[in-house]
């Protein structure tokens, strides 16, 4: 444990950076709190805490977003995101999800509206991150009017509804 801790860490219009970690994170205009706050080496938020934060801008593992809202909790290596909301790729994302301790994801609900995303990756490389997680379970995924484009591939006016899908290695 670090030599300091608090019942609650309150952030007001702060910058938050966590490079060279499992989640490469950079956020600006962060307001919110972590309760209790018990930081550890390599884990600035601690292992067990309630989190509630908003950020004017945030980049997570190279993916930028603005007007971000996150509510959830950290339970050891498990991350529960009860509420996620963000503007990204000229559209919006809302949902709730759980990342298990083994790195697998359970997406209870996710809605992507009017996403406009251009990538320099081939279609195979674009979906390659899905191969890095042990499993992905989707309760409900709704995509409305999405446009995705890369070299030699494009998807336009995509409307998609998925329910009860599991992808596993």
Task: Describe every region a protein language model picked out.
Residues 1-68, 74-77, 91, 96-169:
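Membrane-proximal interfacial segments on either side of biological membranes
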Residues 79-81:
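Repeated loop/turn-to-beta-strand initiation elements of outer-membrane beta-barrel proteins
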């Amino acid at each position: 444990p670090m030599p300091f801790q608090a019942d609650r860490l309150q952030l007001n219009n702060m910058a938050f950076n966590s490079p060279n970690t499992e989640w490469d994170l950079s956020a600006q205009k962060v307001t919110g709190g972590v309760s209790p706050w018990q930081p550890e080496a390599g884990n600035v938020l601690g292992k067990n805490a309630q989190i509630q934060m908003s950020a004017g801008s945030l980049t997570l593992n190279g993916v930028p977003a603005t007007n971000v809202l996150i509510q959830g909790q950290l339970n050891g290596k498990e991350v529960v995101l009860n509420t996620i909301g963000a503007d990204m790729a000229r559209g919006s994302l809302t949902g709730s999800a759980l990342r298990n301790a083994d790195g697998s994801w359970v997406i209870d609900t996710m809605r992507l509206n009017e996403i406009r995303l251009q990538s320099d990756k081939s279609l195979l490389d674009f979906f390659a991150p899905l191969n890095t997680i042990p499993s992905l379970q989707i309760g409900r995924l709704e995509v409305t009017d999405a446009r995705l484009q890369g070299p030699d591939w494009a998807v336009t006016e995509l409307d998609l509804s998925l329910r009860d899908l599991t992808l596993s290695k």
